[in-house]
Design a protein with these regions (language model features):
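Gly/Ala-rich beta-loop-alpha elbow adjacent to hydrolase catalytic centers
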Residues: 105-109, 113
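Conserved acidic catalytic loop of the alpha/beta-hydrolase fold
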Residues: 83-101
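Conserved HGGG/HGGXW glycine-rich cap/lid loop of the alpha/beta-hydrolase fold
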Residues: 6, 19-78
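Short beta-strand immediately N-terminal to the catalytic nucleophile in serine-hydrolase-like folds
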Residues: 103-105, 131
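Conserved alpha/beta-hydrolase catalytic His-Asp/Glu region
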Residues: 139-147, 161-227
Length: 284
């Protein structure tokens, strides 16, 4: 049993919510109080937030969702795009009656969260957490005002797309190991990484490719800026490896946002106590 990625305890309940015809999303829930909704990143399920569903649930109602195509949610052939996933979130939040919500997106889950806010407003959302992803993944490495994960160069964006589209399994293995701070060459030797890979492998290949490539092309920066300008609190987490670049972008674009670092991309799994303490400080 991996301490980094353990099985869900019995205290976490699971339910399915219909968000549109033929599409159900699995939601994990624990605790009571003001709600906090976590959205996982590319391919992964709600189970990556096991430490939040156990520890933060002592203070709040903690929810985590499998987006369409992920985990145990429906895996339709169509609708696997961020605007639709934002609409799925709107239907989910309304169906569950969530208000005064802290909305938290991790990795490409940031795009789900911001797509929801862009298209459906933030009347139900009190606070926003953006966990280690820029709202605009593609960036010009020659422009110091830009910050992104995918360089807009001849061997940048195409390399990402080809790696993802021709070797999804290899891409998933690399991303999973990197998220946990494990050498990708040793991914099959690390228990937590193997479990994270298996979790992500529940997403069909066609959905994985669509979500990844569309993510590279999506820009919801203005939505993040507009939310911050509304006066509602924002907390931005960044992994230490790119924290300086992230903080520069956040300071310029989200000047009132709180900023925190974590050791690696999935620091909420590898160092949950520190992550959860910072979240509690933010939510209050």
């Amino acid at each position: 049993m991996s301490a980094i990625f353990p099985e869900l305890p019995d205290s976490v309940s699971s339910e399915f919510v219909t968000v549109t015809e033929g599409v159900e999303l699995r939601v994990l829930r624990a605790g009571s109080g003001d709600p906090v909704l976590f959205i996982p990143g590319w391919n992964y399920s709600a189970e990556v937030f096991v430490h939040q569903l156990t520890e933060l649930a002592q203070h709040y109602e903690v929810l985590a969702v499998d987006p369409r195509g992920h985990g145990k949610s429906s895996k339709p052939l169509t609708g696997n795009n961020y605007p639709q996933r934002g609409s799925d979130l709107a239907a989910l939040i309304e169906a569950l009656g969530l208000k005064n919500l802290t909305l938290a997106g991790w990795s490409l889950g940031v795009l789900d969260a911001l797509s929801y806010l862009r298209d459906h407003g933030h009347d139900r959302v009190a606070k926003l957490m953006l966990i280690d992803e820029t709202p605009k993944m593609a960036a010009d490495p020659g422009n110091p005002e830009e910050w992104g994960e995918v360089p807009l160069t001849h061997d940048g964006m195409p390399a990402f797309i080809l790696f993802l589209s021709t070797d999804r399994d290899g891409f998933l293995s690399y991303i999973s190991a990197d998220a946990l701070g494990v050498d990708p060459e040793l991914a099959d030797q690390d228990e937590a990484t193997r479990r994270l890979i298996a979790d992500g492998a529940q997403t069909p290949e066609h959905i994985a490719i669509i979500a990844g490539v569309e993510g590279f092309a999506t820009d919801v920066s203005q939505t993040a800026i507009d939310f911050e300008r509304s006066g509602k609190p924002v907390l931005f987490f960044a992994k230490e490896a790119w924290a300086d670049d992230a903080k520069r972008w956040v300071s310029a674009n989200l000047p009132s946002a709180q900023f925190a670092t974590m050791p690696v991309h999935a620091g909420f799994m590898t160092e949950p106590a520190a992550f959860n303490a910072r979240v509690r400080e933010f939510i209050g």
